[in-house]
Amino acid sequence: CMSLIFVLALTGAAFLAIPMILAAGAIPVIFPVSILLLPVLIIVIVYGIAWSAYLVLAQSDRPPYAMIGPPSLSKYIPFVPFSPLRCLKVAKIVCEFIWLGARSMRSFWYWYSLYRTQKNSPEYETVLYSLPFSHNCLDIYPPDVGVVSQNAIVLMIVPTSFFPSFISCNRKLYMPMALRMRKLGYCVVVPDISYYPACQIPQSVVDLRLALSWVGAHIFSYKGDPSRIYVMGMGISSELVALTLVQEAAVMSRVVRRQDDENQDPSSEEELDRLKFNKLMEIYAPQVRLPSLAGVVLAAGMSDVIKCYLHNVEMGTEHLGMLRRWAGPRQYQCIIHSPTHLLNNTKDKFDPAFLPSNFLLIHGGRDKFVPISQAALLQSLLMEVGVKNVELFACRDLGHYDTLKMLLAYPPTHSDSCRYDTPMMKALCSFLV
């Protein structure tokens, strides 16, 4: 904490010193000194921004190579970067994130006004869904009575996680989209899901399985049709949704075709690797039964943890994000928690009957945090294993957060969003049938 305060104070002082140095540079005698001091201040600011980000986001569960000195002392030594290139990359990402936050103020006020209205006269009901395992809740938005009276299509929106996680994971953040879909006649469910640092991916999968199981058993009481349940993931929750479904389908396919594996001679090295991989696969909380799903919507989602982590390495943000610490940290854990790796390693024995028959993938062409190649790879593998309907809705000019904001039904902030808002909602509603 003291290190962070010191770095922030030093960075702030450098920011304040720049205009004074520029003003003093107008004096001929001080001009050479100001020319020399200006690059120094810029370097201090770049390092200060990068170190502040590391001190806030990168200290917990740091990688082994980041430990300095003996274990008893390393926890007291902050993990910060010294490479100028890495600091420049991190500072650039932080500045972009701050600019994104400033641009989102209009969306925040829109959400706050909606939240205050719903607080006084809520159109949803909050229910505990995970007792006795935890005290997670879910919000249920019954369909508008004027549109449909019973057996409405059910849409579960799974919250995503990005910094700050206490905001992005909050189910109330998804209220605008839930109310929008409710008015269109859908029964919407938004559950609490635990993410890092509260837990790692196995517990997140268990939370999702419990939520889906509760919806399948009780949604009829809220005018929903249990035979038409759709689940929607955004960002990192797309990885969670895809993993939960592919994991169960891969393990069930292995159980059904185990006799074939026993009769097959594992002579080749590739076959031995495949059998070892199959032994690592398991269903988290198999006693929790999933309902039959009508379809899956994955928006701006990752599907390959390894490739996404390597992409973060190129951006210089692999230590700041939660991906490795949530889905790993070891390489084999990242592999068995990647839906595309599960599909690729089990495609010869994969039975598509264990997966929903409809998938809709929504992705922005300018998404630099999760490249659109992740969606294209997942689409090709799902089609290869025999899933009947896999659609990819690509928005050429949208970035990662633009796609999420549009799906969350927040007001668009620029022309590109306006251009894609109606087609995206049409594609979503035509898929939810």
Model regions and ranges:
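Short, surface-exposed "cap/lid" segments of acyl-processing enzymes
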Residues: 141-180
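Glycine-rich nucleophile elbow surrounding the catalytic serine of serine-hydrolase chemistry
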Residues: 233-243
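Short beta-strand immediately N-terminal to the catalytic nucleophile in serine-hydrolase-like folds
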Residues: 231-233, 299, 362
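Short beta-strand/loop motif that positions the catalytic acidic residue
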Residues: 354-355, 360-363, 367
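N-terminal cap/lid segment of alpha/beta-hydrolase-fold proteins
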Residues: 15-25, 76-149
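Mobile cap/lid helix-loop segments that gate and shape the active-site cleft of serine hydrolases
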Residues: 254-280, 301, 306-349
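Catalytic nucleophile-loop/oxyanion-hole region of alpha/beta-hydrolase
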Residues: 167-178, 184, 189-227, 409-419
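C-terminal catalytic histidine-bearing segment of alpha/beta-hydrolase fold enzymes
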Residues: 1-4, 362, 369-433
